[in-house]
Amino acid sequence: MPGHLQEGFGCVVTNRFDQLFDDESDPFEVLKAAENKKKEAGGGGVGGPGAKSAAQAAAQTNSNAAGKQLRKESQKDRKNPLPPSVGVADKKEETQPPVALKKEGIRRVGRRPDQQLQGDGKLIDRRAERRPPRERRFEKPLEEKGEGGEFSVDRPIIERPIRGRGGLGRGRGGRGRGMGRGDGFDSRGKREFDRHSGSDRSSFSHYSGLKHEDKRGGSGSHNWGTVKDELTESPKYIQKQISYNCSDLDQSNVTEETPEGEEHPVADTENKENEVEEVKEEGPKEMTLDEWKAIQNKDRAKVEFNIRKPNEGADGQWKKGFVLHKSKSEEAHAEDSVMDHHFRKPANDITSQLEINFGDLGRPGRGGRGGRGGRGRGGRPNRGSRTDKSSASAPDVDDPEAFPALA
């Protein structure tokens, strides 16, 4: 409406959070410093009107300087310590009027643990200086460690594929990119292990030409023992040890009987004899097939059977015995009695007296041929015709004349 005053208005500013008192100082410390300054000014010249006007002018200049400091303060200014020339402005900021800071809604900002107060209420930054980042060392070539624990074999850097996009002809960049650092670049290269699982090839033997040898130091993990262990486990070594032990026992018995001066020559002669016998036994034994079979037959256990001789242990009372044979008549009579027992006929059976003849059981013709050339239905045949057919003999199958139509 025209003539109506607008109650509120707004404007666009560059920093909308400019008036939120975003500083790190404690407002209570600022108030305390302002009170101390007032007391000092009041003690110097007891309150005239000139002193009051001077105090008000100083407070106004201090508030203006504090507003400018709050607007221009940034994150870099907080991290870096201020030069001593700015300390004068900080003192002026601390002498703000207490009425402006007692408004409601102002957030109390506490000091951080790395800051301390001096006696006059000034904040001191005691944060440790940050050390600069480490530099990567590209000049020093990586050395690989050999078995002996010394870095003796140098592997050239060119042989290793450089990770990332830009490599020497490898990766995405190709030759044109050169030594450029790409995504996932790592100057250390791929880690090469001394041993690979399931193979006897070590990483440095491929480049240095050294031959791989198993770990046989006699101690530690994944150890295959020493060369002396194999000699001690061989049967020849065990046999020698047994012979040496026996010779030592014999030597000890001889030394008890003989004086001390004669101990060594007796032991030496016995050892020499044992060595000569061992040399003779070591050669392979050769024999013929017959000799080998003879040795096998000696070792084989012979099986002996207790075989009874004929008529051995026979009783004399059975010498006159003979075999009894049944007569044929008795066998035939026995068979007839068995048949009569199973197939017994009654007395009034007349089946044996009847004669049974099987005639032609085919159906008779239902009609004959008509007299006028047509096929007519004949009458019923006479009863006498059946007797004629039954009395007629069957044709001979083997006679070709009986079947003239087939001829």
Swiss-Prot record:
SMART domains attached to this UniProt entry: HABP4_PAI-RBP1
Record PTM Phosphoserine, positions in chain: S25, S197, S199, S203, S205, S208, S221, S234, S329, S391, S393
Stretches with biased composition (Basic and acidic residues): 70-80, 89-114, 122-162, 183-199, 261-274, 327-341
Compositional bias annotation for Low complexity: 51-68
Chief location of this protein within or outside the cell: cytoplasm
Biased composition (Polar residues): 242-256
UniProt biased composition (Gly residues): 164-182, 362-371
GO biological process: negative regulation of translation; PML body organization; ribosome hibernation
Positions of crosslink type Glycyl lysine isopeptide (Lys-Gly) (interchain with G-Cter in SUMO1): K52, K228
Stretch list, region Disordered: 33-227, 242-288, 327-407
Keywords from the named record: Acetylation, Cytoplasm, Isopeptide bond, Methylation, Nucleus, Phosphoprotein, RNA-binding, Translation regulation, Ubl conjugation
Positions carrying N6-acetyllysine: K52, K68, K122, K140, K211, K328
Positions in coiled-coil regions: none
GO CC annotation, single: cytoplasm
Cellular localization per UniProt: Cytoplasm; Nucleus; Cytoplasm, Perinuclear region
Modified residues (Phosphothreonine): T226
Post-translational modification: Phosphorylation by MTOR inhibits SERBP1 and relieves ribosome hibernation.
InterPro entries per record: HABP4/SERBP1-like, HABP4_PAIRBP1-bd, IHABP4_N
Residues recorded with modification Omega-N-methylarginine: R165, R188, R216, R363, R366, R369
Crosslinked residue numbers (Glycyl lysine isopeptide (Lys-Gly) (interchain with G-Cter in SUMO2)): K102, K211, K228, K280
GO molecular function, one term: translation repressor activity
Pfam family name, one: IHABP4_N
Subunit structure, interactors included: Associates with mature 80S ribosomes. Interacts with EEF2/eEF2; interaction sequesters EEF2/eEF2 at the A-site of the ribosome, thereby blocking the interaction sites of the mRNA-tRNA complex, promoting ribosome stabilization and hibernation. Interacts with SPIN1. Interacts with CHD3 and TDRD3. Interacts with ZDHHC17 (via ANK repeats).
Record PANTHER family: HYALURONIC ACID-BINDING PROTEIN 4 (PTHR12299), SERPINE1 MRNA-BINDING PROTEIN 1 (PTHR12299:SF29)
Family statement: Belongs to the SERBP1-HABP4 family.
Protein name (database record): SERPINE1 mRNA-binding protein 1
Provenance organism: Mus musculus
